[in-house]
Amino acid sequence: MELPLGSDLARLVRVWRALIDHRLKPLELTQTHWVTLHNIHELPPGQSQIQLAKAIGIEQPSLVRTLDQLEDKGLITRHICVHDRRAKRIMLTDMADPIIQAVNDVIDQTRSEILNGITPEEVSELATIISRLESNILSLYEMQS
């Protein structure tokens, strides 16, 4: 009998995300907010919404709601691009720095607790397997297009 690997991976992602959401609740943020803030922080300043959506791996319309929420919280600003008035550039505000640090602390602590009892070698092997699975899936997409 084959293992339900896809279901197992989906369930793992779901419970991991739920735990992150629970732990970020005191900061009034979610895992989606964290992923967005993290990518804005790591990318060169002034990325467009389109560039950010690609970096995160989501469609731009899906990103807009999260950006609206982060803007309402005063963590980002959006500015019309001078070279393309249709594009908006995203910038972190000064308020974002301490929030990003607090979120990273929560994420690091949670990751450490989740990986408790798992050796670095096992984590590395898992990362390699996940990368190979992703590569296989992307190859299948390319073959069908």
Curated annotation (Swiss-Prot):
This is Transcriptional regulator SlyA. Gene3D superfamilies: Winged helix-like DNA-binding domain superfamily/Winged helix DNA-binding domain. Keywords: Activator, Antibiotic biosynthesis, DNA-binding, Repressor, Transcription, Transcription regulation. Transcription regulator that can specifically activate or repress expression of target genes. Participates in transcriptional activation of pig (prodigiosin pigment) and car (carbapenem antibiotic) gene clusters. It comes from the Bacteria. Belongs to the SlyA family. SMART domains: HTH_MARR. NCBIfam families: PRK03573.1. InterPro entries: HTH_MarR-typ, MarR/SlyA-like, Tscrpt_reg_MarR-type_CS, Tscrpt_reg_SlyA, WH-like_DNA-bd_sf, WH_DNA-bd_sf. HAMAP family: HTH_type_SlyA. PANTHER family: TRANSCRIPTIONAL REGULATOR SLYA, TRANSCRIPTIONAL REGULATOR, MARR FAMILY. Pfam families: MarR. GO terms for molecular function: DNA binding; DNA-binding transcription factor activity. Residues 2-135 form the HTH marR-type domain. Transmembrane segments: none annotated. One of its GO terms (biological process) is response to stress. Disruption phenotype: Loss of prodigiosin and carbapenem production. Residues 49-72 bind DNA. Homodimer. SUPFAM superfamilies: Winged helix' DNA-binding domain (SSF46785).
